[in-house]
Amino acid sequence: MKQKVSVPFMLLGILFNVCLIAANLLETKVIQVFGITVTAGLLVFPISYIINDCIAEVWGFRKARLIIWSGFAMNFFVVMLGLIAVALPAAPFWDGAAHFNFVFGMAPRIVIASLTAFLVGSFLNAYVMSRMKLASNGRNFSARAIWSTVVGETADSLIFFPGAFGGIIAWRELLVMMCIQILLKSMYEVLILPVTIRVVKAIKRIDGSDVYDEGISYKVWKIGDI
């Protein structure tokens, strides 16, 4: 018997991976908006948490777990390709090597911090969304989406910034950066929440899915359990 492929799930999974890869590349640029200094990755990275909310809400934690691991694998793959490309000798007539290396030649410390923070933050986001859905019997999606994002984004920032920049940037400045990132990412979630609600309702109607994670295993390694 053939297993039906959910088109909305597939499209959200693709968008999730694209957002993660784009965020990693955009992180190399520091921007200033209204006097606040952040990385350009802030433009797209919160979208991955919104997609994670949608997937966990509609298809449950197990499907979210699959997408999170696929995002990790694709990010790792792109990072490795970038490091290989940086290691290869540049053509003598090409003068863009320094700029290319700046974008793709991320230090191992930053790579490890980024991937670890992504895994922990994303899994916490999906877990909180799943458990709160059970506890509330599916009510109060807005509150669940906001709180799961706050938990996930906080964990992500608490792991990434000290792991990537501890000892390089003063701890007081790191703390300020972390607080700003958490606040802005959470505000991002709140501002786009009306769109998220409509998307979730539309997907539930089109796909006919509304999973409650009763009696499942929340072990992050059980990828085959979907």
Where are these regions (language model features)?
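Extracellular/periplasmic helix-loop-helix junctions in multi-pass membrane proteins
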Residues: 32, 161-180
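Pore-lining and gate-forming transmembrane alpha-helices of multi-pass membrane transport proteins
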Residues: 148, 176-189
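Short, highly charged, low-complexity non-transmembrane loops/tails of multi-pass membrane proteins
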Residues: 200-226
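Alpha-helical transmembrane segments and their lipid-water interface positions
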Residues: 27, 31, 78-86, 121, ...
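Internal alpha-helical transmembrane segments of multi-pass membrane proteins
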Residues: 135-154
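Hydrophobic transmembrane alpha-helices
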Residues: 1-72, 76
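Short aromatic-rich membrane-water interface segments that cap or initiate transmembrane helices
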Residues: 39, 43, 99-113, 180-181
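Membrane-interface interhelical connector segments
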Residues: 84-107
